[in-house]
Curated annotation (Swiss-Prot):
Presence of the UniProt keyword Nucleotide-binding in the record: yes
Enzyme Commission (EC) number: 2.7.2.3
Keywords: ATP-binding, Cytoplasm, Glycolysis, Kinase, Nucleotide-binding, Transferase
Protein name as annotated: Phosphoglycerate kinase
Origin organism lineage: Bacteria, Thermotogati, Deinococcota, Deinococci, Deinococcales
Amino acid sequence: MQNLSSLDVKGKRVLVRVDYNVPVKDGVVQDDTRVTASLPTVNALLGAGASVVLMSHFGRPKGGPEDKYSLRPVAPVLEKVLGRPVKFIASLPGSDETLQAVQELQPGEVALLENVRFEAGEEKNNPELNQKLARLGDAFVLDAFGSAHRAHSSVSGVAAQLPHAAGTLLQTEVEALGRLIEAPESPYVVIIGGAKVSDKIKVIENLLPKVDRMLIGGGMMFTFIKARGGVIGNSLVEDDQVDYARGLLEQFGDKLMLPTDAVAADRFAADADTRVVPADQIPEGWMGLDIGPDTQQAYTEALRGAKTVFWNGPMGVFEFPAFAAGTNAVAAAVGSLKNQAYTVVGGGDSVSAINKSGKADQIDHISTGGGASLELLEGKALPGVEAMR
């Protein structure tokens, strides 16, 4: 991929696709992680004498302006973390008004465009919109790894029209995740959780031949346990994936590690009655909502001595304190490998879990891209990444 140093930006206007799809409540940004993640690229461009025009999507508007999806609340947050004024441009990104506003920018100045999904052609990679957006810069930088798997106008469409390069964040993500696929150091342990096997099929398939152990947790564990003939009560199961899970167990049984015990609940609620039971003997009318203490210990042991670790997906319904112990145990175990193993955490829920556990600073790489991380690990070519080559 071309990096920032390949662009001559002095005195030029650089259009940067960032990922500012942040949680906003009552017009206030709740978490500025994605905003601060863009600073290395923005500061590098400003330092090289450019003016910077930032472009992002936010939420899922229906191809037109909607107040609740405006990026306006992000501007003051960006000003604060950047330490300089940010000009918010409220007109549609592809409009002549926006073009006029960005043409007035001086080197060292920063503008934030309105939500690019307010343009109906954005998600269709519309050629006319691609050209309108390309007018806004002399060069284009893609730094939105979280959107790199989308062939949209603001991701790959504009790239074809302008000199382009990958931003610091995009580069870091692709290199960090690449290490999990290309010659990972052994022992290589992957922890996969979350509700559904169907969401993770391709990742599981692509990684299983490369790993030494794959630890399964979360709701998906019961599809595997049922495939082994276990009794799962009212636990979450994907019946249409049971045969598939059985096939994986037959082919990779020596690598796949399943929970031996589970925290079962009499209903799906924070204050449900709970008991620890064998994972393949969930009582009738009960449901497994977390891995049990024996499994927590076994998974912690399985991680000891690992040289490469990837974790995606929680071990249980960690939003409820009664079912968070499994996820917290994995967070602690992965965090304890600092300086011994190369550790990567990806996927929204596992990132929240690692942040909640206070272990985030002990992880080598925390991925900002949910779907994009998984698609890269599935072995897919991402349109945004390909456009930067």
